[in-house]
């Protein structure tokens, strides 16, 4: 069930139907003067490497310029044509998978994995707050969400005995954006894990918190989600993807990975992931929508168009905004080299796929992360490589609707 039903119970605004309804600015390098041998990565759990807060855009990534993997942030005023000089946010021997969360008023919260633990710090164009370790056990893959910039939920994968388990903690920030407290982490599913749980994504609305993750308890990977209406008491996990039973030759389940969540409209939640139920051609991009703040999700929907059917898709990211607009980005090589592709929700369903010109050329364009601002502008970052195995560079471009093809006007949310 989609986040807006077609005409009966609308829940999302919907973008224009035309595939050519976006104008993109020229691409900008996020980080300057990087040596050719440096590898940059955009690998946050749930693909949240970019966020907009007030009039400021922030991007986080990891690279090995210092000789070890470390995490960095760079800022850009929305009207500016270049990014600030990047700032080093990690403090340990090595750091990975940074995520960024908008707190409001040009402030952000960054989270990352450092030396086997999860760390947080507030960041803004005016400076960095103190770095705070919030986990003790072997942990990683942190994801963050908030509704008000003051009360934040952090989730990550943490080793519990032989296996990893998804845990959650509440973080509180003060009036100036400083971290003032972090609760002890609690398992989202209190049962001891019987196999690994990994790569969580989290969404927070006024109706509560929803966490989705990869889970191996059935002997194959499924996507599970759990919802907490109040506090940190989560419901029993439920399947997000529709499990396709295969033969012994092709294995059990459909093969799913890398779920990402985003809030859209009046507290609704959209999900996307890679799904190999059409196993002959590799992963496809699927989606599902929750109309009740994450307590339940509707039917799975194929987000890509028919032109993508013979190609594998990778690295899905999703973004929504308060107007109810929803867009998904990924990379595939249907045109001969890997390009970034977009699909967005319209009144007719998912749009035809569109490759933004700055992120589609004879180079390798992969690993997108996206954010929609309140005006419906799309902020896109991705990795650009000369060849498939060469060092990647984080690039940025902004997309706007054409003036004669604006989104449909919003309709009241269903009750």
Predicted regions and their residues:
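Bacterial N-terminal signal peptides
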Residues: 4-14
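Extracellular, repeat-based ectodomains that mediate carbohydrate processing or recognition
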Residues: 19-415
């Amino acid at each position: 069930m989609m986040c807006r039903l077609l005409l009966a119970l609308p829940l999302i605004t919907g973008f224009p139907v035309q595939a050519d309804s976006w104008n993109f600015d020229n691409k900008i390098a996020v980080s300057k003067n990087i040596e050719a041998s440096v590898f940059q990565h955009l690998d946050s759990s749930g693909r949240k490497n970019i966020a907009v807060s007030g009039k400021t855009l922030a991007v986080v990534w990891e690279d090995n310029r210092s000789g070890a993997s470390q995490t960095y942030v760079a800022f850009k005023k929305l009207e500016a044509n270049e990014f600030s000089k990047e700032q080093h946010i990690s403090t340990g021997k090595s750091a990975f998978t940074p995520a960024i969360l908008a707190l409001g008023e040009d402030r952000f919260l960054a989270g990352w994995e450092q030396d086997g633990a999860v760390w947080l710090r507030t960041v803004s164009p005016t400076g960095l707050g103190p770095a705070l370790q919030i986990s003790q056990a072997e942990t990683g893959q942190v994801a963050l969400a908030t509704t008000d910039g003051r009360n934040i939920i952090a989730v990550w994968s943490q080793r519990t005995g032989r296996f990893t388990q998804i845990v959650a903690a509440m973080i509180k920030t003060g009036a100036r954006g400083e971290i003032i407290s972090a609760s002890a982490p609690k398992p989202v599913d209190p049962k001891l894990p019987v196999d690994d749980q990994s790569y969580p994504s989290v969404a927070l609305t006024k109706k509560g918190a929803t966490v989705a993750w990869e889970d191996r308890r059935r002997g194959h990977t499924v996507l599970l989600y759990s919802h907490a209406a109040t506090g940190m008491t989560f419901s029993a996990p439920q399947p997000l993807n529709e499990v396709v039973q295969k033969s012994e030759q092709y294995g059990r389940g459909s093969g799913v990975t890398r779920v990402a969540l985003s809030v859209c409209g009046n507290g609704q939640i959209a999900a996307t992931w890679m799904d190999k139920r059409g196993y002959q051609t590799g992963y496809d991009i699927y989606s599902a929508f929750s109309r009740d703040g994450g307590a339940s999700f509707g039917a799975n929907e194929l987000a890509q168009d028919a032109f993508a059917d013979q190609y594998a898709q990778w690295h899905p990211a999703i973004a929504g905004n308060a107007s109810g607009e929803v867009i998904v980005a990924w990379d595939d090589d249907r045109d001969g080299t890997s390009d970034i592709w977009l699909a967005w929700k319209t009144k007719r369903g998912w749009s035809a796929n569109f490759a933004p010109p700055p992120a589609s050329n004879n180079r390798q364009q992969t690993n997108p992360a996206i954010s929609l601002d309140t005006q419906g502008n799309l902020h896109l970052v991705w990795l650009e490589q000369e060849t498939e195995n060469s060092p990647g560079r984080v690039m940025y471009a902004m997309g706007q609707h054409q003036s004669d093809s604006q989104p449909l006007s919003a309709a009241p949310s269903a009750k």
